[in-house]
């Protein structure tokens, strides 16, 4: 390092402590970057890469950005997942001996950004800290530095459970200890794009102990300690706005895994990853930024306590029924700014006068809001506003201290009102009247000298002066004027009287600016005292905002209040998919019932593509989520149970990036549901098994249906193109066939989008191809092939019968197979009975059990012993292939 100049040596010394961040190194009016930082930053920011002499034999790569524009460049880097260490000059270069002393004053990371375009006003910016313990449990602590919110929870499940919780927070950065498993980190970052940071300290930092008074578990305290230590290390400033840590338990909320949330498009769409087109987009009628954030949090964690859900529903009903109360509340909420983030800016010391003016305008609305809610005959409302302080003394303080239109900068003066401070008023009097005196002096000097062009001016170098053109110099009386500056066409003078007034005026103006700054910083400290009250008030207003939002959208979209039942029954009359209906924008939407009594667990849904099967399935899930966050639902009548979990496999969002095919994703999501679902869960499976061959897919689909029906008992919607599976209705007493209806007119299919009882009578695959405008010649050929195939092969679907333990041979049922594209083994027994899937008649021939040889019986015995739930899809396929080869050997 000794070969470098002292300044570069200083840079390298600072950089050594921030290897994982860009170092913005302050040099005068620029932030400079050197070496690898410069090369990478020039590429990422699209700025010029240059070089400079640093004392070594080779020039050093360098790039820089102006300090006044640095905020924009920092945001660009952080938005891409990088960290930025801001290194400032901490002493005056004029008085410095040698190299100016510099220190990192803040480390800006994706999880600690306070403001900027990366921070959506209606979204939290959570930083997560994860701690792993020897017993296999985890503790997850989260902090939103912009609002001061802190949460912690204990997780005892798998990495998938952690993934769910981190996804629910929307964290862009996660803090772990340096020994954390790299494999587990990879699992997290494969699904969620996050910046990984490290912090080994877990003791609660001094001065923050009061924030964990309600936390007793050592594991939770360690996670919070890791989080707080990282925040302190990166921010290096006041954290007075941090709120007491809230403990929550994941078993208090409905579980919806990451893939299901994406499939259902709860907060963003699958295709664009944007809010528009999601359920959140539809429900968000909030008027405040903090209300918008709370709404998203509610949607990420629907409730499972019936009483809490009903409390919310009753409040929503109150707002729905009282139009004037609702509209008056909305008008007041429009005037409320982001109290949570304003409190954060106060604590961080970067609040300006306009921010405090916004705070005052917000507080002016609070008394009327609290009074209106207090008049409601509602226990939930009374409990909600209990302890809420309107902070009227703060409103009064801000009202008499801050000007109505203050500048953005707090160093330019013109912030504090007249009458707030006596000394400031005196200085302003001198400044204002001093300038008046200057104008009067100019008039008097003109009269005395008779020089009409004489003028008094001012500049920063020479101060006040009397300027006289050279043509008029002879008119000046001798001895009274002292020459100050000579110009080409004029001379500038000063008098003793002007000197005296100049001193008074300039001192007053300087003192005004400094005193206003001092008064403002003192005022800011006074406001800090109110931070806890402001944060409590923010929560009250946020909750009211979400509830009125539910009421507003329920009124506008004609939603109905759901009735919650402790029974395992679903009764939805004229249900609609809320987002699809909204996007149709007035066009006809076909509503559908979903009626599943306690003794009906599985709907097996058939019907052509594009007919609405997936929409119907998503519709039920969204109605359930809406109900359990406390919102009315899109139906004319709804009776719903409280579900503990939702599992879905809808759509074809393959995980190709991580090397997983459609079929693998299907199997993993099916495994997740089978392993974790309870009879209080909701399962939605759309065409499970389509990612493999017909026989394999059909076998797996049937096995999954039977397992859910027999072992789990969860309410399930299972759509399929394997029409042969509809015979399961005969053997599974809690399964019912339903289909999406369609009709054929003049050779064209018309989708009716109506769910009806029974199985579909036709597939309409070629008709869908026609709608997609495939070439006519191709369509014609497909019809020829279909006609040939329809009369060929038959598939034996094992019919479920009650058997004793030693019996291994199922009773077969034969059904006609749809076209397949693989070579299959023909059924030898031509005398087996025929079950026509598309018709209603069934052969009355007696079905004889097939005679199996010893080898076939042995294979069946092996199949019976296989534990499919304990195998991966690949292992299952390999085992199936091995058994097939065994049967084919002569």
UniProtKB/Swiss-Prot annotation:
Annotated CDD domains: ABC_MutS1
GO cellular component: cytosol
SMART domains in the cross-refs: MUTSac (SM00534), MUTSd (SM00533)
Region described as Disordered: spans on this chain: 832-851
Single GO MF descriptor: damaged DNA binding
Disulfide bonds: none
Keyword annotations of the record: ATP-binding, DNA damage, DNA repair, DNA-binding, Nucleotide-binding
Disulfide bond among keywords: no
A Pfam family the protein falls into: MutS_V
PANTHER family named among the record's database cross-references: DNA MISMATCH REPAIR PROTEIN MSH1, MITOCHONDRIAL, DNA MISMATCH REPAIR PROTEIN MUTS FAMILY MEMBER
HAMAP family: MutS
Protein name (Swiss-Prot/TrEMBL): DNA mismatch repair protein MutS
Naturally occurring in which organism (per UniProt): Bacillus cereus (strain 03BB102)
């Amino acid at each position: 390092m000794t070969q470098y100049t002292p300044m570069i040596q200083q840079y390298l010394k600072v950089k050594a402590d921030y290897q994982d961040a860009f170092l913005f190194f302050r040099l005068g009016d620029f932030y400079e970057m050197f070496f690898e930082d410069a090369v990478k930053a020039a590429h990422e920011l699209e700025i010029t890469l240059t070089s400079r002499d640093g004392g070594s034999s080779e020039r050093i790569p360098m790039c820089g950005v102006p300090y006044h524009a640095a905020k924009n460049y920092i945001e660009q880097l952080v938005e891409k997942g990088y960290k930025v260490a801001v290194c400032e000059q901490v002493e005056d270069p004029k008085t410095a001996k040698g190299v100016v002393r510099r220190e990192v004053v803040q480390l800006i990371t994706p999880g600690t950004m306070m403001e900027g375009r990366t921070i959506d006003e209606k979204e939290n910016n959570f930083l997560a800290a994860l701690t792993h313990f020897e017993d296999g449990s985890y503790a997850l602590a989260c902090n939103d530095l912009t609002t001061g919110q802190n949460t912690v929870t204990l997780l005892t499940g798998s990495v998938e459970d952690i993934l769910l919780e981190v996804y629910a927070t929307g964290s862009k950065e996660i803090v772990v200890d340096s020994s954390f498993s790299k494999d587990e980190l990879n699992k997290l970052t494969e699904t969620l794009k996050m910046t990984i940071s490290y912090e080994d300290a877990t003791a609660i930092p001094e001065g923050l102990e009061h924030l964990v008074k309600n936390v007793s578990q050592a594991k939770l305290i360690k996670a919070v300690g890791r989080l707080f230590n990282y925040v302190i290390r990166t921010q290096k400033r006041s954290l007075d706005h941090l709120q007491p840590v809230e403990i929550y338990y994941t078993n208090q909320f409905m579980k919806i895994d990451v893939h299901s949330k994406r499939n259902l498009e709860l907060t963003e769409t699958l295709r664009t990853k944007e809010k528009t087109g999601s359920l959140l987009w539809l429900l968000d009628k909030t008027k405040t930024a903090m209300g918008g954030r709370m709404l998203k949090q509610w949607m990420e964690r629907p409730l499972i306590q019936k009483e809490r859900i009903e409390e919310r529903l009753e409040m929503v009903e109150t707002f729905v029924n009282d139009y004037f109360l609702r509209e008056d509340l909305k008008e007041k909420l429009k005037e409320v700014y982001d109290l949570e983030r304003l409190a954060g800016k106060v604590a961080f010391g970067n609040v300006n006068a306009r921010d405090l003016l916004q705070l005052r305008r917000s507080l002016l609305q609070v008394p009327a809001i609290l009074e209106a809610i207090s008049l409601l005959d509602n226990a939930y409302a009374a409990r909600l506003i209990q302890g809420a302080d309107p902070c009227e003394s703060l409103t009064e303080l801000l009202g008499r201290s801050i000007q109505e239109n203050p500048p953005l900068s707090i160093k330019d003066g013109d912030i504090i009102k007249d009458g707030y401070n006596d000394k400031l008023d005196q200085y302003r009097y001198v400044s204002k009247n001093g300038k008046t005196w200057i104008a009067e002096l100019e008039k008097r000097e003109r009269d005395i000298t008779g020089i009409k062009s004489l003028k008094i001016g001012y500049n920063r170098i020479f101060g006040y002066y009397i300027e006289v053109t050279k043509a008029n110099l002879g008119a000046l009386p001798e001895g009274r004027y002292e020459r100050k500056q000579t110009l080409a066409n004029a001379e500038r003078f000063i008098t003793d009287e002007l000197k005296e007034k100049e001193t008074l005026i300039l001192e007053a103006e300087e003192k005004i600016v400094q005193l206003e700054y001092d008064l403002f910083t003192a005022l800011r400290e006074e406001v800090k005292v109110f931070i806890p009250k402001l944060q409590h008030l923010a929560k009250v207003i946020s909750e009211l905002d979400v509830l009125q939002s539910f009421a507003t959208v329920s009124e506008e979209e004609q939603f109905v209040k759901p009735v919650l039942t402790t029974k395992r029954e679903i009764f939805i009359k004229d249900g609609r998919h809320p987002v699809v209906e909204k996007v149709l924008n007035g066009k006809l939407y076909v509503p559908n019932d979903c009626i599943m009594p306690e003794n009906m667990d599985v709907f097996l849904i058939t019907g052509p593509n594009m007919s609405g099967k997936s929409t119907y399935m998503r519709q039920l899930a969204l109605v359930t989520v809406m109900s359990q966050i406390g919102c009315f639902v899109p139906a004319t009548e709804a009776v719903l149970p409280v579900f503990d979990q939702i599992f879905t496999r809808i759509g074809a969002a393959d995980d190709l990036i991580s090397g997983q095919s459609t079929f693998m994703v299907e199997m993993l999501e099916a495994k997740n549901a089978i392993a974790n679902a309870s009879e209080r869960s909701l399962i939605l499976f759309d065409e499970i098994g389509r990612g493999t061959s017909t026989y394999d897919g059909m076998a797996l689909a049937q096995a999954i249906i039977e397992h859910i029906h027999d072992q789990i008992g969860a309410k399930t919607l299972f759509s399929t193109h394997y029409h042969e599976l509809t015979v399961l209705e005969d053997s599974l007493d809690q399964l019912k066939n339903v289909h999406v209806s369609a009709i054929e007119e003049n050779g064209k299919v018309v989708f009716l989008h109506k769910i009806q009882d029974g199985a579909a009578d036709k597939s309409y695959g070629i008709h869908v191809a026609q709608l997609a405008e495939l070439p006519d010649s191709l369509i014609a050929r497909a019809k020829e092939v279909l006609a040939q195939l329809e009369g060929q092969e038959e598939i034996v679907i094992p019919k479920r019968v009650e058997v004793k333990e030693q019996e291994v041979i199922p009773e077969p049922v034969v059904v006609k197979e749809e076209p397949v594209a693989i070579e299959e083994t023909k059924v030898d027994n031509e005398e087996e009975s025929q079950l026509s899937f598309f018709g209603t008649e069934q052969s009355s021939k007696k079905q004889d059990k097939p005679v199996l040889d010893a080898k076939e019986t042995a294979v069946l015995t092996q199949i019976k012993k296989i534990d499919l739930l304990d195998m991966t899809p690949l292992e299952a396929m390999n085992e199936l292939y091995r058994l097939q080869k065994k049967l084919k050997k002569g």
